[in-house]
Amino acid sequence: MNPRRKKRLLITSLLAVALSLAVGLVLFALQQNIDLFYTPTEIIEGKKETGIKPEVGQRLRIGGMVVQGSVKRNPESLKVSFDLVDNGGGIVTVFFDGILPDLFREGQGIVAQGNLLNATEINASEVLAKHDEEYMPPEVSEALVGMDNFKANNK
């Protein structure tokens, strides 16, 4: 192999390694921003298709209906905890330190974003409630079909 071809091969190899490294770093950085959606039953039992459960400490979004009588507020601070349930019967406790949305109520569908503390507890950094009487995110709507106080025609 002549020196000119060796130089081209070396430069091409270095560019391929640099590109691979750059792609790897970008994917690693984006991994921090991925929030997978789960229902309470999926957190406890795993996803239906794969059986994969979220890991402790993983960032995620959870959607479900707030259980009647489960909201507990700390009178000294903004801390609140409540239970979420879906049609699969799984119940997950959500802890939140902040101001809840005005539309947050017991018996209402919500989505909470946060970190998984253990198999049945979430530390939420954000709680989202329906913005009007008709709208519900499709994932939450599917998870709540069949519940007593949920209308399947919510869209």
UniProtKB/Swiss-Prot annotation:
Binding site for heme: H131, Y135
GO cellular component: plasma membrane
Pfam families linked: CcmE
Membrane topology: Single-pass type II membrane protein
Disulfide bonds: none
Cytoplasmic-side segments: 1-8
GO molecular function: heme binding; metal ion binding
Periplasmic face of the membrane: 30-155
Main localization (coarse): membrane
Protein name as it appears in the record: Cytochrome c-type biogenesis protein CcmE
Organism: Psychromonas ingrahamii (strain DSM 17664 / CCUG 51855 / 37)
Lineage: Bacteria, Pseudomonadati, Pseudomonadota, Gammaproteobacteria, Alteromonadales
Gene transcribed to yield this protein: ccmE
